[in-house]
Amino acid sequence: MALERTLSIIKPDAVERNLVGKILSRFEENGFQIVAMKMLRLNQAQAEGFYAEHQGKPFFDGLVEYMTSAPVVVSVLEKDNAVKDYRTLIGATDPQQAAEGTIRKDFAESRRRNSVHGSDSEESAVREIAYFFVESEICPR
């Protein structure tokens, strides 16, 4: 097993509904160490930059509008096999398809308002973490 990092974003719908504490508890209960965290409100340029790979897709503008609608909580999580384990913990993008007990099944409102984002690969995790954090902001434990 290899110690990995992954990026988590608690999205606007979950922040607005005061679910941040419940979601962070799920991370820790499942063995993740929170090694960096910040709350911020993304501006349009930040959201477009983060989701640049989706530019030109029909859902892009709505995604950017949603991600800039309220604050988000961005964190770096660390554990063995973090990327895979986090994806399992959050569940399928569509909460109706998500397994019982996953964050999206328990908290998400819809496919877009699905409460959390998680890196989909180790390569994405490295890129996404660097988008929001400099190495000196990450505090391994």
Curated annotation (Swiss-Prot):
It comes from the Bacteria. GO terms for cellular component: cytoplasm. Its cofactor is Mg(2+). It is an enzyme of class 2 (transferase). Its EC number is 2.7.4.6. Pfam families: NDK (PF00334). GO terms for molecular function: ATP binding; metal ion binding; nucleoside diphosphate kinase activity. The active site is at residue 117. ATP binds at residues 11, 59, 87, 93, 104, 114. Keywords: ATP-binding, Cytoplasm, Kinase, Magnesium, Metal-binding, Nucleotide metabolism, Nucleotide-binding, Phosphoprotein, Transferase. It catalyses: a 2'-deoxyribonucleoside 5'-diphosphate + ATP = a 2'-deoxyribonucleoside 5'-triphosphate + ADP; a ribonucleoside 5'-diphosphate + ATP = a ribonucleoside 5'-triphosphate + ADP. GO terms for biological process: CTP biosynthetic process; GTP biosynthetic process; UTP biosynthetic process. CDD domains: NDPk_I (cd04413). InterPro entries: NDK-like_dom, NDK-like_dom_sf, Nucleoside_diP_kinase, Nucleoside_diP_kinase_AS. It is found in: Cytoplasm. Belongs to the NDK family. Major role in the synthesis of nucleoside triphosphates other than ATP. The ATP gamma phosphate is transferred to the NDP beta phosphate via a ping-pong mechanism, using a phosphorylated active-site intermediate. Homotetramer. This is Nucleoside diphosphate kinase. It comes from Actinobacillus succinogenes (strain ATCC 55618 / DSM 22257 / CCUG 43843 / 130Z). The lineage of its organism: Bacteria, Pseudomonadati, Pseudomonadota, Gammaproteobacteria, Pasteurellales. The gene is ndk.
